[in-house]
Amino acid sequence: MKFNKITITLIFFIFTSCSKPNLCPNFDFNTLEKITTLNNQPYTGRCSKYIDGKIRSIQQYLNGLDYGKWVFYYENGKIQTKGRFNKNGERIGVWRYFYSDGNRKQISKYSKLGERTGMWKVYNQDGDLIDLIDYN
């Protein structure tokens, strides 16, 4: 009996973790306060945007601010940009940018406070390193 409960619980978690996030509703964006709202309330949640059935972005918000992991996709399904935001809506950690063929374009780093930091790397379309920008 205990085995069945564990098995059912594991199956449930596998299916729910593989499901698509909710579709993003039509948000309002307050440009003065830089807050995303839904029905005049700051939005909190994870959602995704699709165009012509193809995923274009996965986004998260916390109290109307960009939050957590964000991923943007090209029309061909390849990743365009991926990175994270802190609870204040500022970019943090490593942000990666890619060309539409999947080759890396840029690697940027941000501190926990959202400040540019470290060595940023820029690549050409062939994947060759063409520029280094030092934010230390």
Question: Language-model segments: what does each one mean?
Answer:
Residues 1-2:
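N-terminal secretory signal peptides that target proteins for export/translocation
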Residues 16-136:
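Glycine/tyrosine- and acidic-biased, solvent-exposed loop/turn segments at the edges of beta-strands
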Residues 5-15:
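Sec-dependent N-terminal signal peptides
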